[in-house]
């Protein structure tokens, strides 16, 4: 399997991108990586480390898409950017997956306009996996589509279901519709229409769920439009980040707190690990005609290595074909 990695995307590129790629080819069998970006910078990082030159190569590109550029314009105008070059490798069949920690908006535009959508899929969906109290959960969509139709939400649920079953090995994952109340009649026109459609599928649909229920692990796949999903995601990230900061501040405020903190250090370490985004790799763009993984902007080498592992599993489990098959089932049932 060949994986295209945007070598210039992310806060710590290309150094930690390169390190993550080297770790990945050492740990995972059957992968070859093409790093796109400024050849001199990437080669300089490679030369600092021991690596298998038969498993990693560089594709030179002189441009970089920054996070403050208009996404669609950047994808269309910067044809020699590291992100576009990586996407084109997948489009041309020269790679089977693309990974980038660059601009989310630009990668979304690239997944749509360079890779294209799977035939029959209305919108590509950003679907991050996050740690919950009971088990990891997915938000679909987490920001790719702020305006949606009910049919889109059903497709998001289907693609999330495929991911859980194929990639994570979870049989019959639960699907919940994010809403302001649990009752069927709650919500706006979109959620009411989506509820009716989801109820008619063979998904393990548990009905409406409130945002507070999501991190409890009450549902595997939280379905919503991208506006709601991104709000839930950013709130979750903010609360998690501030929780650790507040806890640390309280522990360091007194001698008693410091002693207690020292005794509970292993517990805190395990607890923090559960909230470590690097464990999950990245967020897949589901519905694109190619495996596309968005790594976190602040990804370290471990996060890139795990994103590569994630892409490999998606490829091995034939996630694109599984989405196509499940889409056919929806169409047969007029949903």
Swiss-Prot record:
One of its GO terms (cellular component) is cytoplasm. GO terms for biological process: fatty acid biosynthetic process; phospholipid biosynthetic process. Transmembrane segments: none annotated. Pfam families: FA_synthesis (PF02504). It comes from the Bacteria. GO terms for molecular function: phosphate:acyl-[acyl carrier protein] acyltransferase activity. Its main location: cytoplasm. Pathway: Lipid metabolism; phospholipid metabolism. It catalyses: a fatty acyl-[ACP] + phosphate = an acyl phosphate + holo-[ACP]. SUPFAM superfamilies: Isocitrate/Isopropylmalate dehydrogenase-like. It is an enzyme of class 2 (transferase). InterPro entries: FA_synthesis (IPR003664), Phospholipid_synth_PlsX-like (IPR012281). Its EC number is 2.3.1.274. It is found in: Cytoplasm. Keywords: Cytoplasm, Lipid biosynthesis, Lipid metabolism, Phospholipid biosynthesis, Phospholipid metabolism, Transferase. Catalyzes the reversible formation of acyl-phosphate (acyl-PO(4)) from acyl-[acyl-carrier-protein] (acyl-ACP). This enzyme utilizes acyl-ACP as fatty acyl donor, but not acyl-CoA. Belongs to the PlsX family. PANTHER family: FATTY ACID/PHOSPHOLIPID SYNTHESIS PROTEIN PLSX, PHOSPHATE ACYLTRANSFERASE. Homodimer. Probably interacts with PlsY. NCBIfam families: plsX (TIGR00182). This is Phosphate acyltransferase.
């Amino acid at each position: 399997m060949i994986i295209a990695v945007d070598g210039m995307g992310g806060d710590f590129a290309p150094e930690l991108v390169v390190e993550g790629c080297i770790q990945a080819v050492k740990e995972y069998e059957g992968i070859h990586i093409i790093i796109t970006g400024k050849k001199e910078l990437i080669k300089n990082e490679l030369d600092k480390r021991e690596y298998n030159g038969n498993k990693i190569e560089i594709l030179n590109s002189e441009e970089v898409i920054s996070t403050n550029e208009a996404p669609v314009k950047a994808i269309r105008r910067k044809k020699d950017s590291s992100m576009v070059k990586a996407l084109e490798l997948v489009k041309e069949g020269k790679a089977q997956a693309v990974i980038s920690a660059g601009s989310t908006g630009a990668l979304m535009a690239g997944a749509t306009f360079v890779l294209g959508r799977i035939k029959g899929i209305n919108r590509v969906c950003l679907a991050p996996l996050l740690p919950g109290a009971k088990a990891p959960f997915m938000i679909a969509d987490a920001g790719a589509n702020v305006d949606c139709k009910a049919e889109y939400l059903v497709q998001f649920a289907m693609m999330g279901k495929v991911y859980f079953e194929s990639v994570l090995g979870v049989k019959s994952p639960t699907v919940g519709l994010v809403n302001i109340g649990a009752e069927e009649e709650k919500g706006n026109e979109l959620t009411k229409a989506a509820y009716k459609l989801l109820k008619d599928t063979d998904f393990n649909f548990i009905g409406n769920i409130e945002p507070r229920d999501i991190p409890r692990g009450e549902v595997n796949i939280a379905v919503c439009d991208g506006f709601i999903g991104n709000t839930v995601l950013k709130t979750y990230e903010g609360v998690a980040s501030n929780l650790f900061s507040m806890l640390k501040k309280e522990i360091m405020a007194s001698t008693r707190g410091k002693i207690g903190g020292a005794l509970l250090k292993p517990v805190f370490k395990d607890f923090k690990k559960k909230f470590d985004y690097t464990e999950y790799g990245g967020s897949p763009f589901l519905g694109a005609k190619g495996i596309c993984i968005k790594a976190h902007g602040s990804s370290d080498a471990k996060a890139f290595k795990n994103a590569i592992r994630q892409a490999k599993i998606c490829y091995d489990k034939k996630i694109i074909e599984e989405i196509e098959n499940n889409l056919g089932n929806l169409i047969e049932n007029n949903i």
